[in-house]
């Protein structure tokens, strides 16, 4: 039975409990990749009550905000970022429904969400001239197309699908995962975030249960993009924290001091002055990333799901952009520095510590970090308002 979580502190405690369950099996799930669906890990997440924490109060949910979601995601990502990423789009779709869904759509889908059922995504496509050049179409109430990078779709109850309608307008359709004409593949073959199993989904005249005008969501000041990016940032910061934790544990229990460190008087690896300097610097940067994430989340709490003005929307978007850009850099850095700190033995395959770097590098290219810095600079130097889309 899925529990209900109504308070921030309870959500954080639950996330830590889930993380404690996930951590021992993270390396095994990484090695298995798409060859084994992480059913037990996902069941722990689904049964925890965390899937429903952002459902609005008006729709029967607890209505917890970005600060709660960011902290929950960061904690779980530090244990297993693949499992943390599975519900990333789930929370975005909840936000879209909350703002743009009609009462019938919200009741249908939020009832399932509050019962511990997930919303998966089928938003991305390949082969077009650009990322928004969609081929998937809705006509006559059915959906036809092929989607890639469908995180969460394989084991979800519903799939949110971006498509063009008869008029060429962007819409968001919801179809049952087990409905007619829906086929989700396990062809996810990448170096990192392997247990997300973000494979290909094919829709062949699949009946659509709910349709939302998605284009209009980004034609007004909005925070959907910023809130979606906040969870992406939390995954990166969680990876950084997990890498730092494993570096600390390895240094304390397995690493030996180098010849030069012994000559300098070190009795253990943790006494090596260069290790101490590098670790201290890295720990500071990881904590800075955590602080920037928390600050961005607090800003989104203040702005709200529907911003009062373009200025408020800009404030939220830029706060998250900074957290996402810096968090991505620190995640890759921490995962690489782990080996410089811990030494050659830490590269042994049996430890699977390279999964931190593979996860960070794979997830960090979800969308370009350089454009985050570009828009931050454009606003501060020239008062140029950032764009309004799903990645900002």
Name each model-derived stretch.
Residues 190-287:
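Glycine-rich beta->alpha junctions and the first turn(s) of the following alpha-helix
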Residues 340-392:
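Glycine-rich phosphate/cofactor-binding loops in nucleotide/flavin-utilizing enzymes
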Residues 260-271, 302-319, 344-362, 388:
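Charge-rich, acidic-biased intrinsically disordered regions
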Residues 17, 239, 246, 281, ...:
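Charged, amphipathic alpha-helical oligomerization/scaffolding segments
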């Amino acid at each position: 039975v899925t529990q209900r979580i109504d308070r921030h502190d309870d959500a954080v405690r639950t996330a830590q409990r889930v993380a404690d369950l996930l951590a021992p099996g993270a390396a095994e799930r990484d090695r298995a990749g798409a060859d084994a669906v992480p059913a037990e890990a996902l069941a722990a997440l689904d049964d925890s009550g965390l899937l429903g924490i952002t459902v609005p109060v008006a729709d029967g949910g607890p209505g917890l905000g970005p600060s709660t979601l960011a902290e929950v995601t960061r904690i779980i990502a530090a244990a297993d970022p693949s499992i943390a990423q599975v519900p990333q789009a789930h929370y975005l779709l909840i936000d879209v429904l909350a703002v743009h869904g009609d009462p019938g759509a919200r009741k249908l889908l939020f009832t399932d969400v509050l019962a511990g059922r997930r919303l998966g995504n089928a938003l991305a496509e390949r082969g077009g001239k650009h990322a928004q050049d969609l081929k998937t179409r809705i006509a006559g109430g059915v959906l036809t197309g092929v989607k890639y990078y469908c995180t969460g779709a394989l084991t979800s109850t519903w799939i949110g699908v971006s498509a063009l309608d008869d008029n060429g307008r962007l819409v968001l359709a919801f179809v049952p995962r087990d409905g007619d004409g829906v086929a989700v593949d396990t062809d996810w073959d990448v170096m990192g975030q392997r247990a997300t199993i973000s494979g290909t989904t094919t829709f062949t005249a699949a009946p659509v249960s709910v349709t939302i005008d998605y284009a209009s969501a980004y034609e007004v000041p909005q925070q959907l993009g910023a809130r979606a990016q906040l969870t992406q940032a939390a995954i990166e910061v969680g990876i950084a924290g997990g890498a730092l934790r494993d570096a600390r544990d390895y240094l304390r229990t397995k690493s030996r001091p180098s010849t030069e460190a012994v000559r300098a008087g070190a009795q253990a690896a943790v006494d090596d002055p260069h290790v101490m300097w590098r670790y201290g610097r890295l720990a500071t940067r990881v904590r800075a990333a955590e602080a920037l994430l928390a600050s961005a989340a607090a800003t989104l709490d203040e702005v709200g799901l529907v911003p009062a003005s373009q200025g408020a929307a800009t404030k939220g978007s830029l706060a998250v952009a900074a957290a996402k850009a810096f968090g991505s850099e620190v995640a890759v850095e921490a995962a690489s520095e782990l080996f410089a700190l811990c030494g050659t033995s830490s590269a042994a395959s049996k430890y699977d510590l390279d999964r931190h770097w593979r996860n960070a590098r794979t997830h960090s290219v979800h969308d370009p970090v350089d454009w985050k810095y570009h828009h931050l600079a454009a606003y501060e130097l020239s008062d140029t308002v950032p764009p309004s889309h799903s990645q900002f």
